């Protein structure tokens, strides 16, 4: 199993979630976050914004589905501009469902 953390532009998130859902990847968590990447914030007129609002999607999925999910996120979230986002992949050793106390996804 793998965990995907995708940090994306807020205005692209619903489109990404819909695309993932249409491909059968429906289980995820969304969180509003703030942060910055290599661009170190943004200047608009005389105002400098050190950190920008983003949304983080968390998905835990079987390892064999990773490439499909990454492709969907990359294709759907892409604008070609700074701040499109980042995708991080981590291993997940185990997962449990609290309601059923079952192990696995």
UniProtKB/Swiss-Prot annotation:
Signal peptide: none annotated. One of its GO terms (molecular function) is ATP binding. It comes from Methanobacterium ivanovii. GO terms for cellular component: cytosol. The keyword Transcription regulation applies. One of its GO terms (biological process) is nitrogen fixation. Could be involved in the regulation of nitrogen fixation. Belongs to the P(II) protein family. Keywords: Nitrogen fixation, Transcription, Transcription regulation. This is Nitrogen fixation nifHD region GlnB-like protein 1.
């Amino acid at each position: 199993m793998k965990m995907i953390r995708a940090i994306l532009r807020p205005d692209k998130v619903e489109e990404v979630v819909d695309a993932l859902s249409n491909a059968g990847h429906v289980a995820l968590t969304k969180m509003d976050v703030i942060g910055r990447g290599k661009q170190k914030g943004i200047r608009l007129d005389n105002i400098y914004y050190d950190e920008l609002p983003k949304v983080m999607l968390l998905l835990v999925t079987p390892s064999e589905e990773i490439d499909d999910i990454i492709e969907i996120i990359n294709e759907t979230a892409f604008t070609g501009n700074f701040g499109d986002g980042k995708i991080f992949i981590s291993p997940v050793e185990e997962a449990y469902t609290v309601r059923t106390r079952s192990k696995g996804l």
